[in-house]
A protein has these predicted regions:
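A short glycine-rich, Lys/Arg-flanked "PGG" loop and its adjoining helix->strand segment in the class I
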Residues: 147-162
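Acceptor-substrate binding/catalytic loop of class I
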Residues: 184-200
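N-terminal, positively charged/glycine-rich alpha-helical extensions of SAM-dependent methyltransferases
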Residues: 1-30
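Class I SAM-dependent methyltransferase SAM/SAH-binding core
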Residues: 62-64, 68-123
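A short acidic, Gly/Pro-enriched loop at the edge of an enzyme's catalytic core
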Residues: 122-133
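Conserved class I S-adenosyl-L-methionine
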Residues: 164-186
Length: 274
């Protein structure tokens, strides 16, 4: 992965969050279309992925590909784990996550604040068997070597630990081969994705001895969430799209691809055997 191309890809996302008061980059999950704000949909996707996973005051949680830190903050606030570490490849996002955490910190409980470090998902900067829950949402699509990433997750998970992974996938990879030619371009229009199918993920999980405990194909509620988010932006008028107009149309196209099932959105929960 290239810092330069990923920075270019995510700059419009950063502008969108700043213009519309959002805390994260994920697509969201709409239980009912029009039933909540896009910000609430984004939080709903986090809770949907975690599901019934046990996170408590003795847990160490790692958010790999934490972006600007919104979900890490939400998880910390709801579950109060002993430690939450956000690992992010882009230095600019690490800085933004630090700033957000400092602004939202509970002064009476300074230890509850998540910490953020720069790191590569292919070489996670954590000790073997040191993590209880790994959270990875809408980030693995950017990893050129997902097998190494999943192997790294297996390495750092404690026995009985869990991996919660949500990603955009496809069973029609050949359709997106031309888009991958843009991966090297330092432009907001680069795709910067290496898509897997759900079967690819299942094979990799099996190879690492990770037991699948829950799998949801969430394309429809994710597409509904995007539709609500797009409607919110439209409602504020063209001026509110300044600096990310291209990303607005990208998200609208993504919604259509999810509805047509040319792309999918899959949520996986797995456990490392004891």
């Amino acid at each position: 992965m290239s810092q330069r191309t990923l920075e270019a890809h995510y700059l419009p996302n950063w502008r969108l969050t700043q213009a519309h008061g959002l805390s994260g980059y994920n697509c969201g999950y709409a239980v009912q279309r029009g039933g909540a704000s896009f910000h609430e949909h984004q939080q709903a996707l986090v809770w949907r992925l975690i599901g019934e996973m046990a996170i408590g005051p003795k847990s160490t949680v790692v958010d790999v590909g934490c972006g600007i830190g919104g979900p890490a903050g939400w998880i910390t606030e709801r579950y109060q784990p002993r430690r939450l570490i956000g690992v992010e490849y882009l230095w600019s996002s690490v800085a933004a996550a630090h700033a957000r955490a400092a602004a939202e910190a509970d002064r009476d409980r300074p230890a509850s604040r998540p910490i953020f470090v720069q790191g590569d998902a292919h070489r996670l900067p954590l000790a073997d068997g040191s993590v209880d829950v790994i959270f990875n949402l809408e980030s693995a699509l950017h990893y050129p070597d997902k097998r190494t990433f999943i192997s790294e997750c297996r390495r750092i998970l404690a026995p009985g630990g869990a991996l919660c992974l949500g990603d955009i996938t496809t069973s029609h990879r050949w359709l997106f081969t031309p888009a991958q030619l843009l991966n090297r371009l330092p432009s907001q229009y680069n795709s910067n994705v290496w898509l897997w199918s759900p079967k690819d993920y299942r094979r990799a999980f099996d190879a690492e001895g990770l037991e699948l405990i829950r799998h949801e194909e969430a394309s429809r509620p994710v597409a509904d969430s995007l539709a609500d988010g797009i409607a919110e932006i439209r409602h504020r008028g063209p001026a509110s799209m300044k600096g990310f107009r291209g990303r607005f149309f990208y998200l609208a196209f993504l919604e259509k691809l999810l509805r047509a099932r040319l792309l999918r959105y899959d949520l996986f929960c797995l456990r490392r055997s004891r």
